[in-house]
From Swiss-Prot, chains A, B, C:
Subunit structure: Interacts (via C-terminus) with ANK2 and ANK3; required for targeting to the basolateral membrane.
Pfam families: Ammonium_transp (PF00909)
Record gene name: RHBG
Annotated glycosylation sites: 48
Region span, Disordered: 437-471
Bias kind Basic and acidic residues: ranges: 452-471
Cell compartments where the protein resides: Cell membrane; Basolateral cell membrane
SUPFAM superfamilies found in the cross-reference section: Ammonium transporter
Name of the protein: Ammonium transporter Rh type B
Protein's GO biological process: ammonium homeostasis; ammonium transmembrane transport
Catalytic reactions of this protein: NH4(+)(in) = NH4(+)(out); methylamine(out) = methylamine(in); CO2(out) = CO2(in)
Length: 471, 471, 471
């Protein structure tokens, strides 16, 4: 019970434990983390560089867009719940701020551990934000049904598995996945979905009526649009400099535009009375950038980007309409934000598209650029076909890590002392947030109501007339 | 009737037709659109460039700002309507996503069609977003009175005329218009205004009372501020590299600051009891960047930018206060967002300012920079005076294209099967969007109401007086 | 009285006076302000530069982030007040637009006045925005209790003192303060706090109940998040190119992440029933970037950044919980936004951290980079210890300028003709803004309330318990 001493004590003790988590992280930073040669005052000036050569200028603008997506985009996208806005934005803030520190360590140990130290710079900032993004995708699958302590434990585990999966794919298998269709979207989605399945709450049906407030949906659109506009930077942030980043951004731009049209088309087709559903627009329109996550750095061609984006938008919309209910009824997965439709299916499609485009790679098409997109093919160690096979194999590895990890995570989150909110408190901010005496929330009334059709039908129209006649 | 089977069927059929539109666009992309030499893996590496030379790094950060303005800025600026927020943001999203694809083709055929192909890169992304901006300006003039199918038809036509007008001005007449006072603001505004005139609805007066909700106005301010802060990037996005972009951003920055002060000054001067009007702040403060759209790349001088911005802010504010009512009563133009005040008049002023500044151009003032700002003058093909005359002529060409196009568009949009919303459903989301059982909207109550006094309508007129007399 | 002819006349006259302020500024611009050699068409092309060398490309992306923080971040952060949102965003807009022009002149005369002219470019844009930021910090201390004319007078004075203080610190004392812990945060905070003390309103207690509306807090989170994500750019905007900007952004990034965790930990620890307080999250989480404002360009080490950020987050949270009430009761300072917790204390901590890190500077740690971070030490004019002493002395100078200036400002703002809002109208938009007949505001009801239970206040305390016991 939210107000009972025991729970209060539980809450009072759990988040403060963050201090120890932060303390431990700080100690590890002290021991292992150092500036890299593009960040360190002495090392940078030792080499005889022009300042324009500093990677900062090639990657930082993209990083800032990614940073905005992680904190503004993911945070507000989840504000669509009527009385869970504080938690959606607040826990996104907390989770991402923790995940980016923790993944700086995990990814550092796996990717850039030299001479006993992790060397950090703008690339590690981008990689850490990417990992935080995967954690937030999983968060979307359990949104409203988990407390902050549970979420932090989830992040603690997921960041480690994310790093290992990424290491296996990129370094051991030589898989290409610049925009993270595999490492971020597919991994984050299925980790969260399996975890949500383990935490299945049979009595939660009713919670549905707590979703959606007119202005909450407008806040959510802030998240949608910021994710949408900056996604070209997300996919391009870590691709090869020059034409690589240029092409990646361009492909993503076209793919997103097409998925938006596909979403509107399908949403109207399947909507009641042919009306549009805001849930589709908020989410499915974003599927276009997931589907090109792997292939946007490749010679996908502008046409390929449009076709892939349109396909992703339609599939994602159909998923929200028809598959989400099945997911809950048949598979016992309560996918609060529909991450399966937004990240899961489009992610898998994106991997398959990557398999196709990689398999079609030729020296003619890439010229000397082959070295930067498919180094192993350029060096003659692999044929395009075998690269494609490795890409496909990467999908299975990712699904394996995600499922096992999500299942394990679900069991951990069931630990009794973790203060999981009771069914009656799910999707409610009040269990986690103080309501200062004067904090107010809009009075719920039916959507699109014409003033006057509220309780007292007779009086309101009058009042409006009055207001008008005064004017 | 919104819910009638016929209309429902109409809606259900129209938006899905988007799929064919998208299919046709995709086919045209497949046939004609190719990566340019800065985007293509093989072509880029063939030339022996340093990655820092890739245009991506000079223009992409500005592109991202433009992209944010188009989707966040225009979208939320139009959320000021009380129950039309879904449509304002949603249709902005749809229209812009379609327009940028379509204009990539149209502009490509006209501007960068070589060897049977359109070559795309960051410049074409910026140009496409610019064209989408013009379409959204026109959207502002018919906001709330048109359905998505009508809007898409409008975009289909407007994008073509935008491209032709732009081609005539920039390529045939050698007009300079980096920030689009002519090609974007003047064209978009008058195209939309004439179109709105053709669609005049004599019975729509009352709809006014549907405008304005406290939080809707705050959402609109999100749009205003994002448009305001990023406009220096908009004007600078396509100007010459180096000092050109630098100067353009600086001029726009000063002009915007001055137009903001001018708007507050005039809004208080003409406001009832000297109070400020949020509509003025949301819109007129932005006029400063329209007025320097043409001249911001020129040697306008910081003083010139301030003076122009201040003038634009005052003119725009007076337009909202005094001219908009006349526009509806006398000219039968129902300009929902006041695009005439925000884009029309300031756009024309901007052209005239461009005429003046171009006419004053000298080799002394521009030095070797003359080549990049006024190539025809630098090459001795034109005198500054003749360049000024061409600039002025460009205005008439633009007004001609905009008026004829807007009139034609208005007739097309009257086609009966296009599902235009009935007067009673204008400015209402419900005709276009599903209202899931739990979607809620705030209960309308008078502005600035003191809590607790909301039940009794009778006292409302009084109450405000009381509140005042307490003071 | 808001509605009385006298007040109305007062308002109607005051803001229009802005025109003269703008006119005077414009004249000064005409006489003194010129493009610098990186912005002027002739000067830039005279030197034989590659366009990539133009400072625009190194600093403009950071400038845009700073610009977004000033107008979006500060503006929306202050929307947390229930019925003061128009004024929070609107006056932020007005103040910043004036301050950046005025400070371009003041800073220009003090920093870049050569040959009778002020030379402007992207650096002056950044400096002007920084100064506007300091003015907005002071605004936060008097938010809701001052009219626009008073605020403009405050800005007029503060910008001058800001420029002088900055000149004394950076040019006379050789203090390093890239991110402005001293010049921006400490100065802005104490200037505003002393000013607020002079304007103390003993009867204002009750106004507290006007704070906080559910959606207002969500709007405020928009401000919080945009400030949070872009602060690395703020601190890095003016640091030395290359590794300097790179390192500054990285340090700020880590510090912010740690302060977020510290804030959540402490907020839960001190919150009633261990619940989180949105006020802490909105504000204290940002303290992390204030505390590294001075030292983020130095070799702070990633660990140092984490430790400093965590400390700042905890101290700031405790300030909101325990010190703000004392500040009002004992020191008669009504700090509306808690700028003492967000900018004051963290700012002073930041200065002390800078003293420490500067004192530890060695040639080994900085190598040839020492020249760009501590030129006076590199040139042998100072020892690290004496540099540290100068840093510390800079704090006292800043506090002196801020207190004297704030006191003086407070007396000026008391001038009777300045139309200060009466206590009953504090935190109310209606005194400053028109309420068009149809402008509506959400009906206030208790936070997290279950729909339908809003009428009877009696059950409200109970209700929460019930909800709990169901669990």
């Amino acid at each position: 019970m939210a107000g009972s001493p025991s729970r209060a004590a539980g809450r009072r003790l759990q988040l403060p434990l963050l201090s120890f988590l932060q303390g431990a992280t700080a100690v590890l930073f002290a021991v292992f983390v150092r500036y890299n040669h593009k960040t360190d005052a002495a090392l940078w000036h030792r080499g005889n560089h022009s300042n324009a050569d500093n990677e900062f200028y090639f990657r930082y603008p993209s990083f800032q867009d990614v940073h905005a997506m992680v904190f503004v985009g993911f945070g507000f996208l989840m504000v669509f719940l009527q009385r869970y806005g504080f938690s959606s934005v607040g826990f996104t803030f907390l989770l991402a701020a923790f995940a980016l520190q923790w993944s700086t360590l995990v990814q550092g140990f796996l990717h850039s551990f030299h001479g006993g130290h992790i060397h950090v710079g703008v690339e590690s900032m981008i990689n850490a934000d990417f990992c935080a993004g995967a954690v937030l995708i999983s968060f979307g699958a359990v949104l409203g049904k988990t407390g902050p302590a549970q979420l932090l434990l989830m992040a603690l585990l997921e960041v480690v598995l994310f790093g290992i999966n990424e290491f296996v794919l990129l370094h051991l298998l030589g898989v290409r996945d610049a925009g993270g269709s595999m490492t971020i979207h597919t991994f984050g989605a299925y980790f969260g979905l399996v975890l949500s399945q383990v935490l299945y709450r049979p009595q939660l049906e009713k919670s549905k009526h707590r979703q959606g407030l007119y202005h909450s949906d407008l806040f959510a659109m802030i998240g949608t649009i910021f994710l949408w506009i900056f996604w070209p930077s997300f996919n391009a942030a870590l691709t090869s400099l020059g034409a690589g980043q240029h092409r990646t951004a361009l492909n993503t731009y076209y793919s997103l535009a097409a998925s938006t049209l596909g979403t509107f088309a399908l949403s109207a087709l399947v909507g009641e009375d042919g009306r549009l559903d805001m849930v589709h627009i908020q989410n499915a329109a974003l599927a276009g950038r997931v589907v090109v996550g792997t292939s946007s750095e490749m010679m996908l061609t502008p046409f390929g980007a449009l076709a892939a984006g349109f396909l992703a938008g339609t599939v994602s919309t159909l998923g929200y309409k028809f598959f989400t209910p099945i997911l809950e009824s048949k598979f016992k997965v309560q996918d609060t934000c529909g991450v399966h439709n937004l990240h899961g299916m489009p992610g898998v499609l994106g991997v398959l598209l990557g398999v196709l485009v990689a398999g079609l790679a030729t020296h003619e098409a890439y010229g000397d650029g082959l070295e930067s997109v498919f180094p192993l093919i350029a060096e003659g160690q692999r044929s395009a076909t075998s690269q494609a096979m490795y890409q496909l194999f990467g999908l299975f590895v990712t699904l394996m890590f995600a499922s096992v990890g999500g299942g394990l995570g679900g069991l951990l989150l069931k630990l009794p002392f973790l203060d999981s909110p009771p069914d009656s408190q799910c999707y409610e901010d009040q269990v986690h947030w103080q309501a200062p005496g004067a904090t107010l929330s809009p009075l719920p009334t039916p959507a699109f109501q014409v003033p006057g059709e509220h309780e007292d039908k007779a009086q309101r129209p009058l009042r409006v007339e009055e207001a008008d006649t005064q004017a």
